[in-house]
Amino acid sequence: MDLRQREHIETVVQATTYLAPPAVLADRIAHDAIIQNSWRRCVHQYGLDPSRMQEARILPQPRLREHQERIDDFARIARHGLQSLYGQVAGLGYVVLLTDAQGVTVDYIGEARSDAALRHAGLYLGAEWSESGAGTCAVGTALATGQALTVHQADHFDATHIPLTCTAAPLFDTHGNLHAILDISALTSPQAKDSQGLALQMVRIYAAHIENANFLRAHRRDWILKLNVAPEFVDVNPEYLLALDEAGRIVGHNHRARLMLEGELGGAPGATVLGQRFETLFDARLEDLGHYVYSRPSEQRLVALTRSGGLLYLSVLPPALRWQAPPAETQVAMPDALAALTGGDAALQLQLQRAARLVDSPINLLIHGETGSGKEFLAKALHLASARRGGPFVAVNCAAIPETLIESELFGHLPNSFSGAGPRGKRGLIQEADGGTLFLDEIGDMPRELQSRLLRVLAEGEVLPVGAARPVPVRLRVISATHHSLEQLVADGRFREDLYYRLNGARFTLPPLRARTDLDWLVRKLLQEGSAEGSEITLSPAARERLHRHRWPGNLRELRNVLEYARAVCADGYIDVPDLPDSLAGPAPSAALPQPGPAQSPAAAPFDPHQLPPEGMLLMQYLRASGWNLSAVARQIGVSRMTLYRRMERYGIQSPNRRDGGPEPTDA
């Protein structure tokens, strides 16, 4: 403890005892009433001891994430305000903090080279600055009083913090609740508190900007009234904001509007602005609001307050209409990567036509379909068809990564940032996808505590590795996929509703394989992909029928496995029913098992070669041309004689002599 800290402690002790008359204290203690009242709260209400110096408390990562998730929507809106404010003060040594209503720093922008000093001083992500915990400080005292203020150097209660200068302003939600604190602080500053006058003014201005941005987003479905004493600013920078429901009742306001209208209500006990009717507070009729839309000159939009008669300029925004889809445009050319996914199935073709319009759109895409229906194929095709094709395509199966590892796998981590973390740290998969496409398969299985962190990636274009205080910017396209009903997961509380709407910019539903009409094309395509160059795999009609009758619960993945198995076990490149896996090679579901006895009853229909499929008719032509010389035909078509026998039996082809009871067909 140095001399300055010892003297500060003595000053706080004197100010918080009631032994000396206030006039005497005023001569000795050059601190305003707000600071002295805060010191007294620290001692008499919170039980803090000024002689016990405590460094700033930094919350561990899991606790910090809980606080961030609770204020996540508001923090995303505030982020632009933080960045703009930091741009104004960065060269002066300040950092910008956003805290929640408990005083926990949930967002922070500062100079990277000063990280160690800022963390030690508590001007850092996760720092807890409540008045009951840290004593008199800008964040905590602004929370306690609801006022914007500067706590400069020796204004702080705890002598640990007396080198700091901190200026904070409260942020209120649209119902008047104190929701957050905006703060700019510096490790060092001039001795005079007056040097922070500009800082206080800027914090107030940006706090109002953030409040207004949050208001406009929260009440975009309501009537919004913008008011200002100057007509030039009523549209671009309104001082007062009100939201009305369809009945003309006030359902929201910014902080300045609340203070103004509480005065109009006369300060009656229990009187609140919320629920008041527009016509009670303003000398105008609800049905006349249309005269105040911003299309009229601002100087013609004057309205009077009922009680005081004060005049304000008014601009009215009607409720935002739901976006209407534009009329269908002419069909766009299908990129090759997408066209390669279908053989003409109408339902899939429709989905791909929609996808073709969105390959370079910035909106996020959600693919829904059964397991194995081709969700990753579609995501990869969208990537290859887009301008990001030169960047990475990173596929992540959220259900396959253990829950204990998914955070560090996705977001990465700094060296030794948690138990088991390596000394070198790790780039997360989100960073690996920078400049390309991130495909999140089975997104419905992502743990809920990580969903808010993914939301930040989508909203801000930046990722925060585990253990880091500074986010890393990323530029990527996010495509998600699931076989779950995300709507049901949202209803069950297992999936964040705001994340669902972020991911669901456009939705594609893939048909299951059993519903597709291009099975034959798929079979040919898959067999061709897996065959050696110059070789050809064909399918018997009976095997093809079995494929068509199968229900394909595993969809494309199951079909690929079936065909790979059949190709491996078939003879001479010809897949027949016995070559199929057991699940398909048994009797066809609707076919009766053959019974022992004569091969054909006298009443059976006569053999008709014109009813044969194309392969059978071609085989008949070879046999007839050779005079039914089976060995010659087998050599000609490149198969063994036994294979030729099987094919003839399959198509019901017999030598004319054999059908007439004559000799066997010749083999020589």
Swiss-Prot record:
InterPro entries assigned: AAA+_ATPase, GAF, GAF-like_dom_sf, Homeodomain-like_sf, HTH_Fis, P-loop_NTPase, Sigma_54_int, Sigma_54_int_dom_ATP-bd_1
Biased composition range(s): Low complexity: 586-606
Keyword annotations of the record: Acetoin catabolism, Activator, ATP-binding, DNA-binding, Nucleotide-binding, Transcription, Transcription regulation, Two-component regulatory system
Region (Disordered): 586-611
PROSITE patterns in the cross-refs: SIGMA54_INTERACT_1 (PS00675), SIGMA54_INTERACT_2 (PS00676), SIGMA54_INTERACT_3 (PS00688), SIGMA54_INTERACT_4 (PS50045)
DNA-binding region: 630-649
UniProt: ATP binding residues: 369-376, 433-442
Name by which UniProt lists this protein: Acetoin catabolism regulatory protein
Organism in which the protein naturally occurs: Cupriavidus necator (strain ATCC 17699 / DSM 428 / KCTC 22496 / NCIMB 10442 / H16 / Stanier 337)
